[in-house]
């Protein structure tokens, strides 16, 4: 195992400050927030982000998204004592879908509730007073993780609202995609 492989496997045990120091020294960890935003969150790299999102959302190669605009990553709290969100990358796709991509190196044991909170906060941020619910567009939250949330060998998981007895999907308005152990 080379030095680079050792760094990747050890990165999950570093503090956020240590990861930032490693990045400042020129050691790049591909799931570091700063590096990820630099690589995929800039106007001059929109094609990379579009290709990434299409590959993650449509693994069959259909590449349904044709364009997008970056959107505000900061979501304000919806009530006085509410919690705001600072997301990694947010985009409004050409079809109106909202896509959020998060990278996470460490399992802080709150990932599932935080993921659901981010997904629903982004979805509800579409609505303005007086708007029609039929104007809501689908929201997709993609989480690239350097750890495993679930047992087993599956690394890609898709979650949607569905009937727990039949598995019938209610709608695809809220989709959470999880890609695990991407080191």
Predicted regions and their residues:
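Elongated, amphipathic alpha-helical interaction scaffolds
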Residues: 1-183
């Amino acid at each position: 195992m080379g030095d680079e492989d050792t760094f990747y496997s050890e990165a999950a045990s570093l503090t956020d400050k240590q990861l930032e120091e490693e990045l400042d020294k020129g050691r790049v960890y591909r799931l570091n927030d700063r590096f990820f935003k630099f690589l995929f969150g800039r106007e001059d790299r929109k094609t990379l982000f579009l290709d990434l999102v299409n590959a993650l959302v449509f693994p069959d190669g259909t590449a349904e998204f044709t364009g997008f605009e970056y959107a505000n990553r900061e979501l304000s709290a919806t009530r006085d004592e509410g919690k705001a969100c600072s997301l990694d990358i947010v985009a409004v796709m050409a079809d109106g879908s909202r896509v959020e991509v998060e990278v996470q190196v460490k399992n802080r044991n709150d990932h599932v509730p935080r993921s659901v909170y981010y997904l629903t906060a982004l979805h509800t941020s579409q609505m303005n007073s007086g708007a029609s619910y039929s104007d809501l567009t689908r929201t997709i939250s993609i989480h690239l993780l350097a750890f495993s949330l679930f047992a087993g060998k599956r690394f890609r998981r898709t979650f949607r609202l569905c009937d727990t007895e039949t598995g019938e999907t209610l709608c695809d308005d809220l989709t959470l995609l999880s890609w695990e152990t991407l080191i």
